[in-house]
Amino acid sequence: MSKKFSRRKEQREKKKIALERIDILFNLAERVFAYDKELANRYVEIALAVQQKAKVRMPRKWKRRYCKKCHSFLVPGVNARVRLRQKRMPHVVIKCLECGHIMRYPYLREKKERRKAKKQ
């Protein structure tokens, strides 16, 4: 029994370290992007490799900051176009200006949370 619990604890620790590394790499990519886009893209690739190896989910705040197709770090207004659309379901459209890939993220959940906050 003790081995099983220690293994779980070890896996939890590995995932925690992986998430910290992903966060550090994306913060570095954010800082470096202004003067070296290639290095920022490399940091994103390394973060994706860490995420895959550790089998952890990418945090939401970073998931939307890289292109799913070309893995480049996205900065709105520089190499990404961000638009809000209302057709059918309200969503955010992010277009990568490096490869032309379009990503859509619904924001219905955020709207519902705001409505609940207003009612209370």
Swiss-Prot record:
A GO-annotated cellular component: cytoplasm
Free-text remark on how the cofactor is bound: Binds 1 zinc ion per subunit.
EC number: 3.1.26.5
Binding site for Zn(2+): 67, 70, 96, 99
A GO biological-process term: tRNA 5'-leader removal
Reactions catalysed: Endonucleolytic cleavage of RNA, removing 5'-extranucleotides from tRNA precursor
GO MF term set: ribonuclease P activity; zinc ion binding
Quaternary data: Consists of a catalytic RNA component and at least 4-5 protein subunits.
Protein's UniProt name: Ribonuclease P protein component 4
Gene designation per UniProt: rnp4
